[in-house]
Amino acid sequence: MKVSQNKIDDLNLELTIEVEAADYAEIERKKLAERKRNADFKGFRKGMAPASLIKKFFGEQCLVEAVNQVLSQALDAHIKDNSLRIIGEPLSSENQPEVEWTDGNNFTFVFDLGLYPEINFDVVKDDKVPSYTVTVSAKDKATMVENLKKYYEEKNKSAEEQSAAKEEKSDEDIEKEAAERLEAQFKNEAEWRLSKDIRDYFVNKAGISLPEAFLKRWLLVANQGKVTKEDIEKEFDAFLADFRWQLVRGYLMKKYNLKIDEKDLHEAAEAFVTYQYAMYGLGNLPKEMIQEAVVNVLKNQEQVQRIAENVEDSKVMSKLKEEITLEPTKITSLKFKDLK
C-alpha cells in the first residue's frame, strides 16, 4: 500500500491511497468464508455451497467491503500519524479515477481534506469595544405609553364583559411602567449588543481563513437529502461567521484554561427549563418538577451540546470583559436601533 500527500495550500490537502491486491486479499478471503458458512442455497446444506457459487453471488460485495476496510484503516492511520487537524470528514476527490471492481486489481483512491487553520492572537487592554448605555427617546416612550393604554383598555373591556374586576391605571402609573419596561428592554439589548460586538471584534482580530470550497462540499455531503447547493449558498456567510466564532471560542477556552463541569451543565439546564416553563406562564413550579425536567434535558445529547456551547460562550465572554477595555458609550434608543 502506498499513501501520498499533496499539499494544495495551508487549508487543503489531497491524499492518494493505492491499495494493492495483497493488502485486501486475506480480508476478502475471510469475508467469503463467512458468507459460505451462512449461505443457504437450494440444493445444498447450509454452509456447504461450493466456493465458486459463493464468489459468483457475493464476490464483488466482499471485494468492496475488504477494500473499503483497508482503505478506511489506512486513511485513519495517516491522519493520526501525521497529526492532521481535519474539518469534518475526508471527501472523495473530484479527481477520483473510475474504480473497476475486479478481484485482484490494484485500486487508487483520492481524497480531499480540509484543515483547521492555526489561530494565535493576544487579548490586551488595547482591545476596545463600546459598552452602550441607552437613553430612551421621547418617541419610543410615547409609543410604549400608547401601547400600554390600548392594552389596559382592552383588558378592562374584557373584564367588564365578564363581570370581573378592572385594573385601573392612572396616566402616571402607565408612564412609570413604560419607563421601567423600556429601561429593562434596552438594558438587555445593550448586553446582547456588547456580546455581539466582542464576538465580531475577536473574529476579525483572529483573521481566520477557511477552506470554503471544501466546506460547501462537506456540508452538502453531511446533510445529504436535507439541503441543496442553493440552501448552502444562501446560508453560507452565516455559517462561516458562526464557525469562525466557534474556533475563536475554542482557542480562548484553551488559552485561559476554562473548563465546563457537571455543575455548569446542570445549572444551565435548570435555567433553560425554568425559562421554557415561564414562556408558557408556568412560574414558581415545584423544585422536584424542575429537577425532573432537567434530568430529561441532560439525557438528550443534542440538548447537552447546545447547553455546553452556551456555557462556553458565557465563560469566554466573562473572561474577555475582564481582559479588554469596555468603553462607556451613551446613545439614544433611536440611534441604538440603527446600529448594524
Predicted regions mapped to residue ranges:
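Extended, charged alpha-helical "arm"/coiled-coil substrate-binding scaffolds
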Residues: 2-67, 129-340
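Non-catalytic surface loops within mature trypsin-like serine protease
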Residues: 19-21, 113-117
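Generic hydrophobic, aliphatic-rich segments that mediate packing or membrane embedding
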Residues: 50, 54, 67, 71-75, ...
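Active-site helix/loop of acyl-thioester processing domains in fatty-acid/polyketide metabolism
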Residues: 59-83
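Extended, domain-scale alpha-helical bundle/helix-rich regions
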Residues: 78-115
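Beta-strand/loop-dominated core regions that host nucleotide or nucleotide-derived cofactor-binding catalytic loops
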Residues: 126
